[in-house]
C-alpha cells in the first residue's frame, strides 16, 4: 500500500491561501486651494488598504498674490508625502478589526470622530484644506487623518529642543475640534536656527575629585576688638554690656575666669579643607566623565528621537515603519519665478513710467514630485505644501568684529572643544550689557564655516524710508530668544504684497495628481450570482 508524502496530506494547522484579485485604477484628480506662507498645508489625503500599490506624480501651477515689487530673494515651495498606519493613531485599531487579548474581549468599536462646532468648520482651517465642507454645524467626521497630521508634525517638523509635543489623542474619542489647526514647520537650519539652548543634552558632567578631605582648625580669631555679649535685665529695657564672667546661671558663673575678656567670632571662618590629603579620582573616572560629557553633547547636536540616536551614535538608518513612526514617502522643492511688470501707461506722479510691480508663479509638470509605494496595512497617505522664503538676518554683528584677544581667533588645537556660545549681539546688536549674554550654543568655530547673507544701505528695515519691500530678511522689533517664536517659519511676505489683509491668501494653487492605484479588488462591482444564473 502506497502512502502519500506528508507534504500533500491534510493539515489542520493550515488554512487555504486567499487568492485576491488585484485591479488597476486610474484615480487621477485635481484640487484647487488657497494658502498662506509658512503653514504646513494639506493638499492630499487618501486612505490605504492592505495590498495597495500606488504610483503618483504631482503636477502643479501656483501663483503668488500681486507684489509691490519683484523681490530680490528666493521663494520656495516644499512638498512632502507621508504614510501613517491607522494603528499609530488609534490604540484599539487592531481590536476594531477583530483582535482579542482574551477570548471574551469585546470587538465592538467605532472609529473616533470629531464634531463640528456651532457655525461649522471655518474656511481656511485645517478642516477646509482636508476637503471637509465648511460652515456646516454638527458635522461628524473621522478623526484619524487629523491625528495623523499632528503625529507627522511631532516627528518630522517640530524642533524638539524648543517646542513641546502637541496632542495626538489615541483613545476612542470623540476628539475636540480645537486640538487640530494648521501648524508651522521649523525654519531650515543655519548658524542661528541650528543653535542649541544648552551645550549638552541634560546636566553637565562634573569632574570627579574624590569623596572627602580632612578639616583643619585655624586659630586666627585672636583678641581683636570684638564686642561684649549684651543681655537685657528688664524686658524692653536697654542692653547691658559686660564680661561673660559676670553672667550667672543658678548662682554659677558662665565662665570661671575673671576679667573682662570678650568672646569673639572670626567671620572669615576657622575651618579649611586640607586638599593635600584628599582622596583622588582615578584616571578611568576622569575618562568616564569626559566621555559622558561627549555623549551628551552628541545627544544635543544629533537629537534624541530614537531614529536620531541610531544615526548619530551608530550611523544606522532605521526604516520609519520599524520605529512605529510616520513613513516619509517622497518630496521636492520648486522655486517661485518672479516676473517684473513695468509701468507703461503712467497717469499719476506716484507711478511713473518704468515703475516696477511683479507677479510670481511656480509650475511643475514633470516627474520631480512623486513616488511609487506598496502598502501592507490600513492607513492614510497625506501630502503637504509649505511656502517659505530664504532666511536672512540684518541686525547682528558678526563675531569677526568682536575679536580682541588671541584666544578669540581660530586655533587648530582648540577646534575639538565643546560647543561655543552665540552672543545676542550676533543676531541683534543693541550696544548694552545684553549684547554679551548668550543666545544659544553652536559648534566650535561655526562662524568660520558659515557666511551669512547681508542687508545694507536703504534695504535695511530701520532706514527711515526703507526699501525692505525688495527683500524678505527678518527684522526683529525686540531681542529674539531661542524659542518657539523664533524657530517657527515666519516669512515677512506681507510687506512685499499689495494686499496685506490677514484673511487674504498669499498663494493660489492648482494641483493635479497623476494617480495610478492597484488595489486588491475586482475591476467592477458586479453583484454575485452564486452560480445560479
Swiss-Prot record:
Record bears the keyword Glycoprotein: no
Under the heading Pfam families, the entry gives: Phage_F (PF02305)
Q: Where in the cell is it found?
A: Virion; Host cytoplasm
Q: Which residues form a coiled coil?
A: none
Repressor as a keyword of this entry, yes or no, is: no
Chief location of this protein within or outside the cell: virion
**Which keywords appear in this protein's UniProt record, sorted alphabetically?**
Capsid protein, Host cytoplasm, T=1 icosahedral capsid protein, Virion
Query: InterPro entries attached here?
Result: Capsid/spike_ssDNA_virus, Microviridae_protein_F, Microviridae_protein_F_sf
Q: Which GO terms describe its cellular component?
A: host cell cytoplasm; T=1 icosahedral viral capsid
**Which Gene3D superfamilies does the record cross-reference, listed alphabetically?**
Microviridae F protein
Residue numbers spanned by region Disordered: 333-353
The molecular function terms in GO held by this entry are: structural molecule activity
According to its UniProt entry, the function of this protein is described as:
Assembles to form an icosahedral capsid with a T=1 symmetry.
Indicate what this protein is called per its UniProt record. Capsid protein VP1
Per the UniProt record, the source organism is Bdellovibrio phage phiMH2K
Amino acid at each position: 500500500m502506497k502512502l502519500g508524502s506528508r507534504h500533500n496530506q491534510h493539515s489542520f494547522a493550515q488554512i487555504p491561501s486567499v487568492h485576491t484579485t488585484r485591479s488597476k485604477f486610474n484615480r487621477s484628480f485635481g484640487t484647487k486651494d488657497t494658502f498662506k506662507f509658512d503653514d504646513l498645508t494639506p493638499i492630499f489625503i487618501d486612505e490605504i488598504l492592505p495590498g495597495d500599490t500606488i504610483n503618483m506624480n504631482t503636477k502643479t501651477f501656483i501663483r503668488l498674490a500681486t507684489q509691490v515689487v519683484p523681490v530680490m530673494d528666493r521663494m520656495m515651495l516644499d512638498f512632502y508625502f507621508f504614510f501613517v498606519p491607522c494603528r499609530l493613531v488609534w490604540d484599539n485599531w487592531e481590536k476594531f478589526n477583530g483582535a482579542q487579548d482574551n477570548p471574551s474581549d469585546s470587538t465592538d468599536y467605532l472609529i473616533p470622530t470629531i464634531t463640528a462646532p456651532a457655525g461649522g468648520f471655518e474656511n481656511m482651517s485645517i478642516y477646509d484644506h482636508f476637503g471637509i465642507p465648511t460652515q456646516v454645524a454638527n458635522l461628524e467626521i473621522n478623526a484619524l487623518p487629523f491625528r495623523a497630521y499632528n503625529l507627522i508634525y511631532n516627528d518630522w517638523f517640530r524642533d524638539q529642543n524648543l517646542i513641546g509635543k502637541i496632542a495626538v489623542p489615541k483613545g476612542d474619542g470623540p476628539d475636540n475640534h480645537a486640538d487640530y489647526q494648521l501648524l508651522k514647520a521649523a525654519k531650515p537650519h543655519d548658524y542661528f536656527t541650528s543653535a542649541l539652548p544648552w551645550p549638552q543634552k541634560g546636566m553637565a558632567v562634573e569632574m570627579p575629585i574624590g569623596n572627602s578631605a580632612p578639616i583643619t582648625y585655624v586659630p586666627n580669631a585672636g583678641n581683636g576688638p570684638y564686642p561684649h555679649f549684651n543681655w537685657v535685665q528688664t524686658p524692653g529695657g536697654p542692653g547691658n554690656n559686660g564680661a561673660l564672667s559676670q553672667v550667672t546661671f543658678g548662682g554659677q558663673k558662665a565662665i570661671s575666669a575673671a576679667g573682662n575678656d570678650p568672646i569673639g567670632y572670626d567671620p572669615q571662618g576657622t575651618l579649611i579643607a586640607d586638599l593635600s590629603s584628599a582622596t583622588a579620582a582615578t584616571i578611568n573616572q576622569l575618562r568616564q566623565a569626559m566621555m559622558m560629557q561627549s555623549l551628551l553633547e552628541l545627544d544635543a547636536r544629533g537629537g534624541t528621537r530614537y531614529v536620531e540616536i541610531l544615526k548619530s551614535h551608530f550611523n544606522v538608518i532605521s526604516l520609519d515603519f520599524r520605529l512605529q513612526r510616520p513613513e516619509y514617502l517622497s518630496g521636492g522643492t520648486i522655486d517661485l519665478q518672479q516676473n517684473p511688470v513695468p509701468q507703461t501707461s503712467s497717469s499719476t506722479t506716484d507711478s511713473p513710467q518704468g515703475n516696477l510691480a511683479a507677479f510670481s508663479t511656480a509650475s511643475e509638470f514633470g516627474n520631480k514630485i512623486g513616488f511609487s509605494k506598496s502598502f501592507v496595512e490600513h492607513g492614510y497617505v497625506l501630502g503637504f505644501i509649505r511656502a517659505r522664503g530664504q532666511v536672512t538676518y540684518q541686525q547682528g554683528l558678526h563675531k569677526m568684529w568682536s575679536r580682541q584677544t588671541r584666544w578669540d581667533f581660530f586655533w587648530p588645537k582648540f577646534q575639538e572643544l565643546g560647543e561655543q556660545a552665540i552672543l545676542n549681539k550676533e543676531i541683534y546688536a543693541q550696544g548694552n550689557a545684553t549684547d554679551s549674554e548668550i543666545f544659544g550654543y553652536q559648534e566650535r568655530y561655526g562662524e568660520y564655516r558659515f557666511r551669512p547673507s547681508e542687508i545694507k544701505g536703504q534695504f535695511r528695515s530701520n532706514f527711515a524710508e526703507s526699501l525692505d519691500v525688495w527683500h524678505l530678511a527678518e527684522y526683529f522689533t525686540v531681542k529674539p530668544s531661542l524659542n518657539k517664536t523664533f524657530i517657527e517659519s515666519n516669512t515677512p511676505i506681507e510687506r512685499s504684497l499689495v494686499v496685506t489683509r490677514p484673511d487674504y491668501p498669499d498663494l493660489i494653487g492648482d494641483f493635479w495628481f497623476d494617480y495610478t492605484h492597484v488595489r486588491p479588488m475586482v475591476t467592477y462591482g458586479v453583484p454575485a450570482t452564486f452560480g445560479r444564473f
